[in-house]
UniProtKB/Swiss-Prot annotation:
The active site is at 164 (proton acceptor), 386 (proton acceptor). Belongs to the plant acyltransferase family. It comes from the Eukaryota. GO terms for molecular function: acyltransferase activity. Its EC number is 2.3.1.-. Keywords: Acyltransferase, Transferase. The lineage of its organism: Eukaryota, Viridiplantae, Streptophyta, Embryophyta, Tracheophyta. This is Uncharacterized acetyltransferase At3g50280. The keyword Acyltransferase applies.
Length: 443
């Protein structure tokens, strides 16, 4: 177990609190469905800076400037009681209350303890992330963003947790890029003002009214079970090329039409389910988090801030997934993503309002063996975040919202590579690591 000493915890507020036009952000059905979901956790590992640079002070000061631009992260979740129909409504109050900044030290941990050659993730790593067990609805009293800077023996880990109703992966990494730029050069003159996603669901009344009975009692916090194991699987550029060639060989697509993300997702899905101990006739699902920004009609700004994610799903049987091959599995994912339309998103939002079923934890407690959940994206430029003492040497996902089959995709540190941070049941992982067919496509 690693020893972590917490040096300080403070609230960092925006440098300039200008309330004009920033008072309130209404929440869509896509946001409100996450009311009881854990804060999303991610982290970047850096080389250790020279202490003479006073980097902790620089990080804190530049965070204040970054929050002036990304002001929703400095707000709080607010609840309004609608007594006329016994419902409640939620919105983001951009009041400048601030984000949490934690400074910690762990002299007993080195970079090699975290970046193990076999890709395994130590159990103690969870204490390097803030907001463990905190859910979106807790944003009524908790900061919407928390950051923990942990000094290690030979490195620094910046772990963070954020309220997923406020932002998605694209937005949090855009925030990090802005924060790192301000920290490294001290300037913000050329940075663009924040463009919010807006209320992109046409014909819907806001704020949305939710029955009080659905919000009175938060489900108990679900800590990461010790039965789950984490592993980072590294796919080299050659591995990915081989997977895409195999897809082409089975279904005849040209290579440039084969998505690297979808090919690796299909490979992981087939391999994990093959070792999950399910009967051939049982159903299996692959969930994929889809960015709606450019899929809506009209499309949103590519850089707009907010949570703009739709969870799409492919369903088949265990037997069919195994028998039909990698190319077929890829095609199911590809066809599902290509077939999504603006009408699908509109119908989902309208149905959610009519028959509210708030997601309680992750994507459902029953999905421990029969599903995989593909989240994040190798498109996110995680390795470009230089705070002034060098670029990151690794990126990791925290333990929140973890069920077996959760797959968090990151770009690899080498160009063209993909790292998959996987959360699996121990018996599934043991079988996967003995699977030659799986390992020969994984570096």
């Amino acid at each position: 177990m690693a020893d972590v000493t917490f040096i300080s915890s403070s609230i960092v507020r925006p440098q300039i609190i200008n309330q004009e036009g920033r008072e309130k952000i209404h929440l869509t059905p896509f946001d409100l469905n996450l009311l009881y979901v854990d804060y999303t956790q991610r982290g970047l590992l850096f080389p250790k800076p020279d202490p003479e640079t006073h980097f902790i002070s620089r990080l804190r000061t530049s965070l204040s400037s970054a929050l002036d631009i990304y002001f929703p992260f400095a707000g709080r979740l607010n609840k309004v009681e609608n007594h006329e129909d016994e419902t409640v409504s939620f919105y983001i109050n951009c009041d400048g209350s601030g984000a949490k900044f934690i400074h910690a030290v762990s002299d007993s941990v080195s970079v090699s303890d975290l970046l193990r050659p076999d890709g395994s993730v130590p159990d103690f790593f969870r204490i390097f992330y803030p907001m463990n067990g905190v859910k979106s609805i807790d944003g009524l009293s908790e900061p919407l963003l928390a950051l923990q800077v942990t000094e290690m023996r030979d490195g620094v880990f910046i772990g963070f947790g954020y309220n997923h109703m406020v932002a998605d992966g694209a937005s949090i990494w855009n925030f990090f890029r802005t924060w790192s730029k301000i920290c490294s050069n001290g300037q913000r003159e050329n940075l663009q003002p924040l463009a919010l996603k807006g209320l992109f669901v046409d014909g819907m009344d806001f704020p949305i009214h939710i029955p009080v009975s659905d919000t009175e009692t938060s489900p108990p916090s679900r800590e990461l079970s010790p039965t789950f194991k984490e592993r980072v699987f590294h796919f080299t550029k050659r591995n990915i090329s081989d997977l895409k060639a195999k897809v082409n060989g089975e279904i005849g697509l040209r290579d440039h039409k084969v998505s690297s993300l979808q090919a690796v997702s299909a490979h992981m899905w087939r391999s994990i389910i093959r070792h999950s101990g399910l009967n051939q006739e049982e159903k299996t699902r692959c969930f994929v988090a889809v960015d709606l920004r450019q899929r809506l009609n009209p499309p949103l700004d590519k850089e707009c801030f907010g949570h703009v994610i739709y969870n799409s799903v492919v369903t088949t049987t265990v037997g069919e997934l195994h028998d039909q091959g990698l190319g077929w599995a890829f095609l199911q994912i590809n066809n599902m993503l290509r077939s999504l339309t603006n009408e699908d998103y509109r119908i989902y939002a309208e149905n959610w309002v009519r028959n509210m079923k708030i997601q309680k934890s992750g994507l459902g407690s029953k999905m421990t063996r029969d599903s995989v959940i593909v989240s994040s994206s190798p498109r996110f430029e995680v390795y470009d975040n230089d705070f002034g003492w060098g670029k990151p040497i690794a990126v990791r996902a925290g333990p929140s919202n973890s069920i077996s089959g959760k797959l968090v995709f990151f770009r690899g540190i080498e160009e063209g590579c993909i790292d998959v941070h996987a959360f699996l049941l121990p018996d599934v992982l043991v079988k996967l690591l003995a699977d030659v067919e799986f390992l020969e496509k994984c570096g």
